[in-house]
Amino acid sequence: MDFQGSVPTYSYDIDYGMSAPCQKINVKQIAAQLLPPLYSLVFIFGFVGNMMVFLILISCKKLKSVTDIYLLNLAISDLLFLLTLPFWAHYAANEWVFGNIMCKVFTGLYHIGYFGGIFFIILLTIDRYLAIVHAVFALKVRTVNFGVITSVVTWAVAVFASLPEIIFTRSQKEGFHYTCSPHFPHTQYHFWKSFQTLKMVILSLILPLLVMVICYSGILHTLFRCRNEKKRHRAVRLIFAIMIVYFLFWTPYNIVLLLTTFQEFFGLNNCSSSNRLDQAMQATETLGMTHCCLNPVIYAFVGEKFRSYLSVFFRKHMVKRFCKRCSIFQQDNPDRASSVYTRSTGEHEVSTGL
């Protein structure tokens, strides 16, 4: 069977969806060799980074602002996404051995975390736009209660967006092994396949990039009125870094997903092209997954105050256990750390929440 953009592995040996059966054994063999170690690396680095953000926000910052709430939910989204990777790694190397219920559970967690991460990146972008461009209005709406309400709504939307994957994905025996993959109704196969692909492209690429372009354009216009050229340049570099990183990590996957779904339209409905697209899907999807490893860096650790919290957390909970008499453990107050940017110009908001 062919790839539907719903699970991050390739479980087939032959594709019967073409005019003649297409051998996919090489694709499966490559996936079995490369995907498990790659998924493992993404899991390790992503889990450590996002767990650090989670622990610092809970134990140190105490969720005092809308930005803190969105950062916490972004970390939770990434953690949900990452927790499924060990199971997909095992699936890529072998077959699905965890049963039908767990197939649906892990598919649901994967996509809820996936869409949740995207939606909270969008919320963080809009939040920064309001804080910098419409500062007076932001003082009224950027409350903790508002952050909680919008987060609950965002999770509901993420669950709703993931429902087709949860409903249609199931585990069943195909040939000599069990798979965990989407199975659309035969009479509506092409509709659901196209719908799923267009949904992924719109929600994971077009929508976030559109929001980033609009919001960051307004932020840049405001920052260019800043008198401190050095601080302004740093903020501008950070903004462009966020957009470029997101574009580079997710655009290849969405392009390959479109080409794979509409192979006949693009004249790629032959066995050779299908195999190459499958291999490209493996590479680009893994590349996109690594973006969740960068989220803690580009959305949290760029802030000087957040790095101060990280330093205090590290000294208090990690190194102190091995060196109780070291003078380095004198308690610092992160709230007294100077920010990179001042609130009067709005650059502080860029450094702590972009």
Swiss-Prot record:
Q: Does the keyword Transferase apply?
A: no
Question: Species name for this entry?
Answer: Mus musculus
Give the record's family classification: Belongs to the G-protein coupled receptor 1 family.
Phosphoserine: residues bearing it:
S338, S339, S344, S351
Report the record's disulfide bonds. C22-C271, C103-C180
> Which membrane topology term applies here?
Multi-pass membrane protein
Q: CDD domains under this entry? A: 7tmA_CCR5_CCR2 (cd15184)
Q: Which residues lie on this side of the membrane: Extracellular?
A: 1-32, 92-104, 169-200, 263-279
Compartments where located:
Cell membrane
The identity of this protein, by name, is C-C chemokine receptor type 5
Q: Where are the transmembrane segments?
A: 33-60, 71-91, 105-126, 144-168, 201-220, 238-262, 280-303
Cytoplasmic side, ranges? 61-70, 127-143, 221-237, 304-354
Sorted alphabetically, which InterPro entries does this protein's record hold?
A: CCR1-9-like (IPR050119), Chemokine_CCR5 (IPR002240), Chemokine_rcpt (IPR000355), GPCR_Rhodpsn (IPR000276), GPCR_Rhodpsn_7TM (IPR017452)
Sulfotyrosine PTM positions: Y10, Y12, Y16
Q: Which GO terms describe its molecular function?
A: actin binding; C-C chemokine binding; C-C chemokine receptor activity; chemokine (C-C motif) ligand 5 binding; identical protein binding
Return the Pfam families for the record. Answer: 7tm_1
Q: How does it assemble?
A: Interacts with PRAF2. Efficient ligand binding to CCL3/MIP-1alpha and CCL4/MIP-1beta requires sulfation, O-glycosylation and sialic acid modifications. Glycosylation on Ser-6 is required for efficient binding of CCL4. Interacts with GRK2. Interacts with ARRB1 and ARRB2. Interacts with CNIH4. Interacts with S100A4; this interaction stimulates T-lymphocyte chemotaxis.
Q: Mind telling me which GO cellular component terms the entry cites?
A: cell surface; endosome; external side of plasma membrane
Q: Which GO terms describe its biological process?
A: apoptotic process; calcium-mediated signaling; cell-cell signaling; cellular response to lipopolysaccharide; chemotaxis; defense response; immune response; inflammatory response
Positions bearing carbohydrate = S6
- Free-text function comment from the UniProt entry: Receptor for a number of inflammatory CC-chemokines including CCL3/MIP-1-alpha, CCL4/MIP-1-beta and RANTES and subsequently transduces a signal by increasing the intracellular calcium ion level. May play a role in the control of granulocytic lineage proliferation or differentiation. Participates in T-lymphocyte migration to the infection site by acting as a chemotactic receptor.
Q: Where is the lipid attached (S-palmitoyl cysteine)?
A: C323, C326
Q: Which gene encodes it?
A: Ccr5
